[in-house]
Regions:
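Sec-dependent N-terminal signal peptides
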Residues: 4-14
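Beta-strand-enriched cores of mature, soluble protein domains
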Residues: 20-159
Length: 159
């Protein structure tokens, strides 16, 4: 039992030493309806594309584009999923997926998960972010706060 306690303590201490940095992303641009399937008066599927620019707290500015699927049932958004591409200088790219649960949809808050990235910033993969998105007509504004490893932040700063 004593050995087990020591093992858990060692794991806890080693995880406690992993340092993370706040990575802030602000995105803005235009929303365009790509395709819509109207199943009934109350049910549909809409596919949007978002295109615009982003800036971050590492001093970067770049392009962002997203593909968003929205499923509405009984006039209520039941599911929202998106794939987002960030394009930095020198064509360095990072991809994240966005998901919002039913209870988060009206709040405009969800989570991003970085799934792929160029080799030069690959330490960002598996990082999680909380984001908020707001729309005004066909314009969007998104603010995301990510907790990323220090190594990932340094990689992003060096783009």
């Amino acid at each position: 039992m004593k050995k087990l306690t020591l093992i858990f303590a060692a794991i806890f201490i080693s995880f406690g030493n992993i340092s993370a940095k706040d990575y802030i992303l602000e995105q803005q641009g235009k929303r365009t309806l790509v395709k819509e399937h109207i199943y009934s008066n109350t049910d549909n599927l809409k596919v949007f594309k978002l295109e615009g620019t982003f800036k971050d707290n590492a001093g970067n500015f770049g392009e962002v584009n997203s593909i968003v699927n929205v499923i509405t049932i009984n006039n209520v958004v039941e599911k929202l999923e998106a794939s987002n591409e960030l394009i930095y200088n020198d064509n360095v790219k990072a991809y994240n997926t966005a998901k919002r649960a039913n209870n988060e949809l009206k709040q405009g808050v969800g989570k991003w998960y970085f799934t792929h990235a160029s080799k030069s910033i690959n330490a960002i993969i598996n990082s999680e972010c909380i984001y908020s998105i707001r729309y005004y007509k066909d314009n969007f504004l998104t603010l995301g706060k990510c907790e990323i490893p220090d190594k990932a932040f340094e990689q992003i700063k060096n783009i």
